[in-house]
Amino acid sequence: MKTFVLHIFIFAFVAFASASRDSAKKIGSQYDNFETCITEHGLTEDDIFSIGEVSSGNHKTNHEDTELHKNGCVIQCMLEKDGLMSGADYDEEKMREDYIKETGAQPGDQRIEALNACMHETKDMEDKCDKSLVLVACVLAAEAVLADSSEAA
């Protein structure tokens, strides 16, 4: 069974690194629990943000707060089903392990540093849905910046 980056990468999370190249793809759609989680939250695939929309930050300006929250709940659902979150709490070590497996990142890789920074940035958020979306958005944005800087080099 596939697990998160995006899981952010999904982590989504955070393991969305490979998927982040396909900006039209729906966030988390490549993971086994995607359909289950959107159904559990009464959404359809059309309701879910695209990877490009989240990595660029456009999801924050193009959508209402309720849409943001619902998308975050779907992400949190996938993270929880993959054992990466329990409620609003991350399993940071498992999150890193899964991210490394998904992305092939090695110790010292800037993507791992970005994941750590994003987990630190969101660790005190209490709402599990908002926390999940902010985490994944942070990781995807960092991956986009790192990809742009490596392409420019």
Curated annotation (Swiss-Prot):
<comment type="function">
    <text>Colony queen number, a major feature of social organization, is associated with worker genotype for Gp-9. Colonies are headed by either a single reproductive queen (monogyne form) or multiple queens (polygyne form). Differences in worker Gp-9 genotypes between social forms may cause differences in workers' abilities to recognize queens and regulate their numbers.</text>
</comment>
<dbReference type="GO" id="GO:0035176">
    <property type="term" value="P:social behavior"/>
</dbReference>
<dbReference type="InterPro" id="IPR006170">
    <property type="entry name" value="PBP/GOBP"/>
</dbReference>
<keyword id="KW-0589">Pheromone response</keyword>
<keyword id="KW-1015">Disulfide bond</keyword>
<keyword id="KW-0964">Secreted</keyword>
<feature type="disulfide bond">
    <location>
        <begin position="37"/>
        <end position="77"/>
    </location>
</feature>
<dbReference type="GO" id="GO:0005615">
    <property type="term" value="C:extracellular space"/>
</dbReference>
<dbReference type="Pfam" id="PF01395">
    <property type="entry name" value="PBP_GOBP"/>
</dbReference>
<dbReference type="GO" id="GO:0005550">
    <property type="term" value="F:pheromone binding"/>
</dbReference>
<protein>
    <recommendedName>
        <fullName>Pheromone-binding protein Gp-9</fullName>
    </recommendedName>
</protein>
<keyword id="KW-0590">Pheromone-binding</keyword>
<dbReference type="InterPro" id="IPR022354">
    <property type="entry name" value="Pheromone-bd_protein_Gp-9"/>
</dbReference>
<keyword id="KW-0732">Signal</keyword>
<comment type="subunit">
    <text>Homodimer.</text>
</comment>
<feature type="signal peptide">
    <location>
        <begin position="1"/>
        <end position="19"/>
    </location>
</feature>
<comment type="similarity">
    <text>Belongs to the PBP/GOBP family.</text>
</comment>
<keyword id="KW-0813">Transport</keyword>
<feature type="disulfide bond">
    <location>
        <begin position="73"/>
        <end position="129"/>
    </location>
</feature>
<feature type="disulfide bond">
    <location>
        <begin position="118"/>
        <end position="138"/>
    </location>
</feature>
<keyword id="KW-0085">Behavior</keyword>
<dbReference type="GO" id="GO:0019236">
    <property type="term" value="P:response to pheromone"/>
</dbReference>
<dbReference type="InterPro" id="IPR036728">
    <property type="entry name" value="PBP_GOBP_sf"/>
</dbReference>
